[in-house]
Curated annotation (Swiss-Prot):
It catalyses: a 2,3-bis-O-phytanyl-sn-glycerol 1-phospholipid + 8 A = a 2,3-bis-O-(geranylgeranyl)-sn-glycerol 1-phospholipid + 8 AH2; 2,3-bis-O-(phytanyl)-sn-glycerol 1-phosphate + 8 A = 2,3-bis-O-(geranylgeranyl)-sn-glycerol 1-phosphate + 8 AH2; CDP-2,3-bis-O-(geranylgeranyl)-sn-glycerol + 8 AH2 = CDP-2,3-bis-O-(phytanyl)-sn-glycerol + 8 A; archaetidylserine + 8 AH2 = 2,3-bis-O-phytanyl-sn-glycero-3-phospho-L-serine + 8 A. Gene3D superfamilies: D-Amino Acid Oxidase, subunit A, domain 2, FAD/NAD(P)-binding domain. Pathway: Membrane lipid metabolism; glycerophospholipid metabolism. One of its GO terms (cellular component) is membrane. Is involved in the reduction of 2,3-digeranylgeranylglycerophospholipids (unsaturated archaeols) into 2,3-diphytanylglycerophospholipids (saturated archaeols) in the biosynthesis of archaeal membrane lipids. Catalyzes the formation of archaetidic acid (2,3-di-O-phytanyl-sn-glyceryl phosphate) from 2,3-di-O-geranylgeranylglyceryl phosphate (DGGGP) via the hydrogenation of each double bond of the isoprenoid chains. FAD binds at A18, D37, C48, A49, G51, R104, A128, D284, G296, I297. Reduction reaction proceeds via syn addition of hydrogen for double bonds. Its cofactor is FAD. This is Digeranylgeranylglycerophospholipid reductase 1. It comes from Methanothermobacter thermautotrophicus (strain ATCC 29096 / DSM 1053 / JCM 10044 / NBRC 100330 / Delta H) (Methanobacterium thermoautotrophicum). It holds the Pfam family FAD_binding_2.
Length: 397
C-alpha cells in the first residue's frame, strides 16, 4: 500500500480558536501551513458558550462580526448562596472588560476561515494517529475518511485540547491533575426569565463546588445555563449539579433545554514546558485558561498568535530547536502566564470560603463604590472588604 506524504513547514493539529490563530499567523509570516481537525465541521459540536472582551479581540486584530456575536453585555449580576446579589452595570460603572457572548460554532469556523485567507491549507475530518521524530522535524501519521497518509513537518503545533496526545507523543508532560480539571455542563434553554437580558449572572458557593454557575443571555427568553465543578470538591457530576441548579434558580425553573454540552477546562495554569524540538503547545492543551473564570478563548488565541509568529520566524531561520522555539514560551510567560498565576492564587483562596463567608462578602460589597469593574478590580475590592483575603492575596494585587 502506497502512503502519500505531504510536506509542510508548520502542521497545526486542532482547529479551535488557538489552533486557527496559530495557523493564521504562521501563514502570515510566510510559512507553508497545514491545519487539520478531526471533526467534519469545525466548531461542531458546539463548545460551551463564552464571553470575550472587546479589548481582547482588539489585541488580536479581530473585528467583531454580528454573524458570531449573540449578545453585547452591559454588566454582570453576582449572586451569593443566600441570594444576596451585586449588580455592576455600564450605566453605573466603567466596564473595561465588557464584551460579547459568542456563538461558538460560528466563531470557531470564522477563525479557521481567517487562517485560510492568510494562506493556510485546512483538512477536516482528519485525525493525527501518531508521530515520530525525524532529523529536521516530525513525521505525523494521519487518517482522513479512511485514507491513511503521512505529513512531514518542520514544526508541529499541538492545539488538540486538554490532555493533549500530540504533546505526549513529543515527550512533554501537559497532563492536568484532577484537582485542576473543571468539569462543565451547559444547557441552551428557552423560557428563561432573567432579571436583565443584557447582563450575565454568576452564582457562587455550594451550587457549583470548586467553580460557579452562570446564566448567559442570548436574546429574548433564550440563555445558556451552565456551571463548572471540581471533582475533588464534590461526589456529583457537573450534569447532576446543573439539573439541581436549573430547578433551584428562579430564572430557569420554568425553562426547557434544547441543547446539552459537556466539557472540561484545565484551570491549574500552564505546564512547566510548552516547547520541545520542532514542537509547541497552545490553547487548552497548554493550560492557557484563566483559572478564576475558566475562560480561555482570548488567552488561547494570544498563545496561538505568539506560536504562529515564532514558528514562521524559526522556519525562515532554519532553526527549529527547542532553544529557538523557547522564545514562544518566554513570551507566553510574560504576556499570559503572570496573569494566569495570579488568578490561580485567587481561585485557590476562594475554594477555602464557606457559603456563609461568601454571603458576608456579597453583603459587604453592597456598600462598596465601584468606579470601574474588571476581574482585577473585583479582586482588589475583595481584599478591601475581607481581612482573610488581604492576608492571602494582598501582595499579588
Amino acid at each position: 500500500m502506497i502512503i502519500m506524504v505531504t510536506e509542510v513547514d508548520v502542521l497545526v493539529i486542532g482547529a479551535g480558536p488557538a489552533g486557527s490563530t496559530a495557523a493564521k499567523h504562521a501563514a502570515l509570516g510566510g510559512a507553508d501551513v497545514l491545519l487539520i481537525d478531526k471533526k467534519s465541521e469545525i466548531g461542531a459540536p458546539k463548545r460551551c458558550a463564552e464571553g470575550v472582551s472587546i479589548g481582547g479581540l482588539e489585541s488580536l486584530g479581530i473585528e467583531p462580526n454580528p454573524r458570531w456575536i449573540t449578545k453585547k453585555l452591559d454588566g454582570v449580576r453576582m449572586v451569593s448562596p443566600n441570594g444576596t446579589d451585586v449588580w455592576l452595570t455600564s450605566d453605573k460603572v466603567e466596564l473595561p472588560e465588557a464584551g460579547y457572548i459568542l456563538e461558538r460554532k460560528v466563531f470557531d469556523k470564522f477563525m479557521a476561515m481567517d487562517a485560510a485567507r492568510a494562506g493556510s491549507r485546512i483538512m477536516v475530518k482528519t485525525i493525527a494517529t501518531g508521530m515520530e521524530r525525524t532529523d529536521d522535524g516530525y513525521l505525523v501519521s494521519a487518517e482522513c475518511m479512511g485514507e491513511k497518509f503521512e505529513i512531514k513537518a518542520r514544526i508541529v503545533i499541538a492545539a488538540d485540547g486538554p490532555e493533549s496526545r500530540v504533546a505526549r507523543w513529543a515527550g512533554l508532560n501537559t497532563a492536568t491533575r484532577p484537582k485542576d480539571m473543571e468539569s462543565a455542563a451547559q444547557f441552551e434553554m428557552v423560557g428563561v426569565e432573567m432579571e436583565d437580558n443584557n447582563c450575565i449572572e454568576f452564582y457562587f458557593g455550594s451550587v457549583a463546588p470548586g467553580g460557579y454557575a452562570l446564566d448567559i443571555p442570548e436574546g429574548d427568553d433564550i440563555a445558556n445555563v451552565g456551571l463548572g465543578v471540581l471533582s475533588t470538591e464534590t461526589d456529583k457530576s457537573a450534569y447532576e449539579h446543573l439539573l439541581e441548579f436549573v430547578e433551584s434558580c428562579p430564572a430557569t425553573r420554568n425553562a426547557q433545554p434544547v441543547e446539552l454540552n459537556i466539557g472540561g477546562d484545565p484551570v491549574g495554569g500552564m505546564p512547566k514546558k510548552l516547547v520541545a524540538d520542532s514542537l509547541m503547545v497552545v490553547g487548552d492543551a497548554a493550560g492557557q485558561v484563566n483559572p478564576l473564570t475558566g475562560g480561555g478563548i482570548i488567552s488561547g488565541m494570544k498563545g496561538g498568535m505568539l506560536a504562529g509568529q515564532v514558528a514562521a520566524a524559526a522556519v525562515s531561520e532554519g532553526d527549529v530547536t527547542a532553544r529557538r522555539l523557547g522564545e514562544y514560551e518566554r513570551l507566553c510567560r510574560e504576556e499570559i502566564g503572570d496573569e494566569i498565576s495570579k488568578y490561580l492564587k485567587v481561585k485557590e483562596y476562594l475554594l477555602t470560603l464557606s457559603d456563609s463567608e461568601l454571603d458576608s462578602i456579597a453583603e459587604a460589597f453592597q456598600d462598596v463604590e465601584f468606579e470601574k469593574v474588571s476581574t482585577t478590580e473585583l479582586v482588589k475590592k475583595l481584599i478591601k472588604v475581607s481581612p482573610k483575603a488581604l492576608l492571602k492575596l494582598g501582595k499579588l494585587f
